[in-house]
């Protein structure tokens, strides 16, 4: 895959505090994307963002409950205000059962 095509693009990744969402956020940032990491856990989400930044990436954290439509609107608004645009969304948020 040619990751040069994503360089400079802006994406929201939900569920970015761990698991698949975290891996996607890290991969995007490592390949030059600007990433908005969204998750419910401030501590875990901010830790991911701090690590991305410490490794030369560009990311912000927005605490978000993806079951709340107003929170989703706020997430998109914050992304656009911070980066000036939004190129994509990875909808990865979920709830563990069991």
Question: Model-predicted segments: where are they?
Answer:
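Hydrophobic/aromatic anchor residues within beta-strands of the central parallel beta-sheet
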Residues: 59-61
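Conserved glycine-rich cofactor-binding loop
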Residues: 10, 17-19, 41
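Aromatic pocket-lining residues of Rossmann-like dinucleotide-binding sites
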Residues: 28
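Helix N-cap/beta-alpha junction loops of NAD(P)-dependent oxidoreductase domains
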Residues: 96-98
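Conserved glycine-rich Rossmann-like NAD(P)H-binding loop of the short-chain dehydrogenase/reductase
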Residues: 31-48
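The beta1-alpha1 cofactor-binding region of Rossmann-like NAD(H)/NADP(H)-dependent oxidoreductases
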Residues: 42, 63-75
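Rossmann-fold scaffold of SDR-type NAD(P)-dependent oxidoreductases
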Residues: 14, 86-94
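Flexible N-terminal pre-Rossmann segment of NAD(P)-dependent oxidoreductases
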Residues: 1-12
């Amino acid at each position: 895959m040619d990751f040069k095509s994503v360089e400079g693009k802006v994406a929201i990744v939900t569920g970015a505090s761990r698991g698949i969402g975290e891996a996607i956020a890290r991969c995007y940032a490592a390949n030059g994307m600007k990433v908005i990491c969204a998750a419910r856990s401030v501590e875990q989400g901010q830790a991911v963002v701090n690590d991305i930044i410490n490794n030369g990436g560009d990311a912000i954290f927005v605490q978000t409950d993806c079951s709340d439509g107003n929170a989703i609107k706020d997430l998109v608004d914050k992304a656009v205000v911070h980066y000036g645009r939004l190129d994509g969304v990875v909808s990865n948020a979920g709830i563990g059962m069991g």
